Amino acid sequence: MELGEFQDVIRRTYRTRDAARGVDGTFRWMVEEVGELARALRLDDDANREHEVGDVLAWLASVASIAGVDLDQAASRYAHGCPRCGAIPCACPPR
């Protein structure tokens, strides 16, 4: 599934709820899901990692949609490697 297709499915599925919650409320839900992903990673919970990554992606798609951001366009910044140095793998000095 392409990012734009995924974003469209999420938009059609949750548009009404996301609109009622607004950008701030939807962003807070996404942050909660990031916390759940952090817990699954910290506990090395193989069974739950994929589930939580999917939840984070879905909430990111919701935030992007109600903020007017196209995920395909946003991801295209990385289409040719590192957006700073242009290399694959990144050749930037560590930060």
Which residue ranges define each predicted feature?
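Flexible "arm" and connector segments at domain edges
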Residues: 1-53, 57-95
